[in-house]
A protein has these predicted regions:
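Aromatic-lined carbohydrate-recognition surfaces of secreted/lumenal glycan-active proteins
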Residues: 143-158, 223, 239-256
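Bacterial N-terminal signal peptides
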Residues: 20-31
Length: 468
């Protein structure tokens, strides 16, 4: 059945290029990309920290809600290092549904086949302003602004064969009609390494740069399926836009054998499918917190300044009014599981993106997000590695940033209370005794000649250990 579509068309005049000139231009774009750092480590010297709308608003987020969450982030979390405000998927749909990915969506789009913010949700985008006013508002709070996009080109743009901005190409020349995202019907893929495809990605990169976008989450590109050609094309386009823009790839699990490609183009990439507020899942979607240990163990040693494997968002706090999965609710993770989530993400140095509704933040969740000792592990630890996993107990070590000790994280994967005992040497620590500080409780615990701790089911501790 043909899908019903409604398009908002904006028109304006743009310069046209002769076909030969356009082809030469695109070749120059590709050749000069190497001269513009595609892995600008200054974009993400430490794992990015911020808020993403999907876990609480799904595909329904509007301008007032973005601003309210941004204000709360600026007032309460910015001083702890939280910086990004990211508008997740389908901000261009004028009739969003809580379930998302509707096959009867109406899209806002400009005359060049580029999605624009839905005016009934983002009124400041009127008069062809796009996200520029909202980005300026977020910037005025001392924060950075991000958006979600789906790889490819809108099907409607291809059906109408709209022109591609600043070129003599049209949408039909850029599209690969045989390639669609298996779980989102909005777009066709881009025909790999074609001048028209490069021209389209360059056109949207320049649009986002003009809006003031600092962070782009690109979906249906890192796994099921992995689209290396499109990753490279988008990376080149962002470089040519002349605005430093952080590139985040979703969903996971990104393939380990593509590590060099991922590092060459992106600042962060997902290493699992979506994480939600459960401990374990028998299904591939969604994943639970307890399912992340093995993935974190593989990827954490491969982190590098500017390039961060991503364990996905933090589904904590209030998930609503329209979460991307399930009914509106307070997170179903226990307090112990939430600490385990924050501890594993931090010691493996994953990006930290809050999923909860900041405008309904409670004291407990705020305490998780403002613990400077925990956040310091995520932002500044080195040599993070898992040293033990016996199926019930997981133990990690990481070096402190000052080189004066180690961080020691101990996790109980079992459902019941467990007493965990280990000699220091069994964990790769050569000293006879160590001074312990509990990072969650901010308490010095004195010296210990071995590790002995009782943990609740799915609980953890994070110590700073020093031989001095």
């Amino acid at each position: 059945m043909r899908r019903v579509r409604k398009t908002v068309i904006l028109t304006k005049n743009v310069p046209r290029l002769h076909p030969c000139a356009a082809a030469i231009f695109v070749v120059l774009v590709c050749a000069s990309a190497a001269a513009v750092s595609s892995d600008d480590r200054n974009l993400a010297e430490t794992p990015p920290m911020g808020w993403n709308s999907y876990d609480s608003y799904g595909t329904t987020i509007n301008e007032a809600q973005v601003k309210a969450n941004a204000r709360w982030l600026a007032d309460h979390l910015k001083r702890f290092g939280w910086r990004f405000v990211v508008v997740d998927m389908e901000w261009y749909v004028t009739n969003p549904t809580p379930s998302g990915n509707s096959r009867n969506s109406h899209y806002a789009m400009d005359a060049f086949g580029r999605y624009t913010p839905a005016l009934n949700r983002f009124p400041s985008a009127a008069n062809e302003a796009g996200f520029k006013p909202l980005a300026a508002y977020v910037h005025s709070l001392g924060l950075k602004f991000g958006i979600h996009i789906l790889r490819g080109i809108p099907k409607e743009a291809v059906e109408k064969d709209l022109p591609i901005a600043d070129s003599d190409y049209h949408a039909s020349q850029a599209a690969d009609r045989s390639d669609t995202c298996p779980w989102n019907p909005d777009n066709y893929g881009i025909a790999a390494n074609t001048p028209a495809g490069h021209a389209y990605y360059l056109s949207i990169a320049r649009l986002y740069a003009a809006w003031g976008v600092d962070f782009i989450k690109i979906d249906c590109i890192a796994s099921h399926p992995y689209k290396g050609d499109e990753i490279a094309m988008i990376s080149r386009a962002l470089n040519q836009s002349r605005r430093s823009t952080l590139m985040s790839l979703s969903p996971g699990a990104a393939p380990l054998d593509k590590l060099d490609e991922l590092r060459g183009h992106a600042q962060m990439w997902r290493i699992s499918d979506d994480i939600w507020d459960l401990w374990h899942s028998e299904k591939s979607y969604p994943q639970g917190v307890g399912d992340q240990f093995s993935l974190a163990a593989v990827w954490a040693p491969l982190t590098a300044r500017g390039h961060w494997p991503d364990l996905d968002m933090l589904p904590i706090g209030r998930l609503g009014p329209s979460p991307g999965w399930g009914p509106p609710r307070q997170t179903r993770l226990t307090n112990d599981e939430q600490r385990t989530l924050m501890t594993l993400w931090s010691i493996s140095r994953s990006p930290l993106m809050i999923g909860g509704n900041l405008t309904e933040m409670d004291e407990w969740t705020t305490s998780l997000l403002t613990n400077r000792e925990i956040l310091a592990v995520d932002q500044h630890a080195t040599d993070s590695r898992q040293v033990l996993d016996d199926g019930r107990t997981v133990i990690w070590l990481a070096q402190t940033s000052d080189g004066d000790g180690e961080y020691l994280a101990v996790f109980n994967r079992a459902e019941n209370i467990q007493v965990i005992e280990r000699n220091w040497k069994d964990l790769g620590l050569e000293g006879n005794s160590y001074r312990l500080r509990d990072a969650w409780e901010h308490k010095n615990l004195g010296r210990a000649r071995s590790l002995k701790i009782q943990l609740p089911g799915h609980g953890c501790v994070l110590y700073r250990v020093s031989s001095k």
